[in-house]
Design a protein with these regions (language model features):
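Ferredoxin-like alpha/beta domains used as RNA- or RNAP-binding modules
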Residues: 1-179, 183-184, 207, 221, ...
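Basic (Lys/Arg-enriched) interaction patch that binds polyanionic ligands
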Residues: 174-224
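Conserved small/polar residues in nucleotide/adenosyl-binding loops
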Residues: 226-233
């Protein structure tokens, strides 16, 4: 609860600073739970025109930017950039996971809230981060696990990255949230209920504690920190 109150206070401070001083302000990267807190405050913060920015369309981690061209009369720059990590020797490159890339960044002393989404595309990875740490990543990240890598800053629009999806078909008794979570992630209703109570289920970016709400076509459901009971690497 203390962390939640601190975040609410910080959001209000950044909102007031942006509005009173006519300058753009930003949070660090927020996870989905933190974004849910922001969503609950959104109407209260609306006078400073806040928006979520993650660097790409389907973000899960994002910064809140306060301010707009309409409000200030000038366009602000979002301090979020994209780095592409590539193997130096493609022939000897390992198959690296999200955890591998994140661990390599954390080993450089980079704090988690400065890093956004990490998207993997074959032997390449795209990492969104705050602009002021891109230099550190480019200069110091030269190895992920046993694979030698090099880093370059890229424009996201020019990467050609295509979001990949896994299609799953099935029948559900109703369009309730808990039913769909169980079906989509192959979980028992009991585990789905535990995830909801543990604040790990989000519907269109808002945290859900009850599985009874109805889901519509096009809605987005996400679950955090679920580990399959079957062993896997």
């Amino acid at each position: 609860m203390k962390e939640e109150e601190l975040l609410k206070k910080r959001l209000m401070e950044l909102c007031e600073k942006a509005y009173n001083q006519n300058i753009y302000t930003y949070t660090h990267f927020l996870n989905e739970y933190e974004q849910s807190i922001y969503q609950d405050m959104k109407q209260e913060l609306a006078y400073a025109h806040p928006i979520l920015v993650g660097g790409h369309k389907y973000f899960t981690r994002a910064v809140v930017m306060f301010g707009s061209e309409e409000l200030f009369g000038y366009q602000g720059e979002v301090p979020v950039v994209c780095a592409r990590i590539s193997p130096v020797f493609d022939k000897f490159a390992e198959e690296l996971s999200h955890r591998d890339y994140l661990g390599a960044l954390m080993n450089l002393g980079i704090e988690r809230h400065l890093i956004g989404d990490i998207l993997i595309d074959g032997r390449y990875a795209y990492i969104f981060c705050m602009e002021h740490i891109i230099g550190v990543i480019k200069e110091q990240l030269d190895q992920v696990r046993h694979t030698r890598v090099f880093v370059e800053e890229v424009s996201w629009e020019e990467t050609g990255y295509v979001q990949k999806y896994k299609k799953k078909e099935g029948f559900v008794a109703s369009m309730r949230l808990d039913v769909l979570v169980s079906q989509a992630f192959s979980l028992s209703r009991n585990i789905s209920e535990k995830l909801l109570k543990s604040q790990k289920v989000f519907h269109n970016g808002k945290m859900c504690l009850s599985g009874g709400q109805k889901i519509k076509q096009g809605d987005i459901i996400s679950c955090l920190l679920y580990t399959s009971p079957s062993p896997r690497d």
